[in-house]
From Swiss-Prot:
This is UPF0102 protein Sden_0272. It comes from the Bacteria. Belongs to the UPF0102 family. GO terms for molecular function: nucleic acid binding. SUPFAM superfamilies: Restriction endonuclease-like. Signal peptide: none annotated. PANTHER family: UPF0102 PROTEIN YRAN (PTHR34039:SF1). Gene3D superfamilies: 3.40.1350.10. InterPro entries: Restrct_endonuc-II-like, tRNA_endonuc-like_dom_sf, UPF0102_YraN-like. HAMAP family: UPF0102. Pfam families: UPF0102 (PF02021).
């Protein structure tokens, strides 16, 4: 795997196998982007996908910064408002380090 797009496709497939339903990907606003939008039971799930081919300079999880979390939250709120969605949501991270996948639910 060499691109972010491939990582997002792998993440989507992995999450669908875990029972989540795909809704959208790469939702972009001027102030932030949502990698994956999924549904899981009654929850809307906003998934940040992080990918690293090696961990020499830190793993995929270390790549998430507070400012990025702010942008993701803002984009998710905007998505919910635009689509008139009034339901619980959560923010997950799917970190891919080489061939290892770590799915963290409700991270922020």
């Amino acid at each position: 795997m060499t691109t972010g797009q491939e990582a997002e496709q792998l993440a989507r497939t992995y999450l669908e196998k875990q029972g989540l339903e795909y809704v959208a990907h790469n939702v972009r606003y001027p102030f932030g982007e949502l990698d994956l939008v999924m549904r899981h039971q009654d929850f809307w799930v906003f998934v940040e996908v992080k990918f690293r081919t090696n961990t020499q300079f830190g793993g995929a999880l270390q790549a998430i910064r507070p400012k990025q979390i702010q942008r993701i939250r803002k984009a998710a709120n905007h998505y919910l408002q635009l689509n008139k969605i009034n339901a619980p949501c959560r923010f997950d991270v799917l970190a891919i380090d080489g061939l290892q996948i770590n799915w963290l639910q409700g991270c922020f």
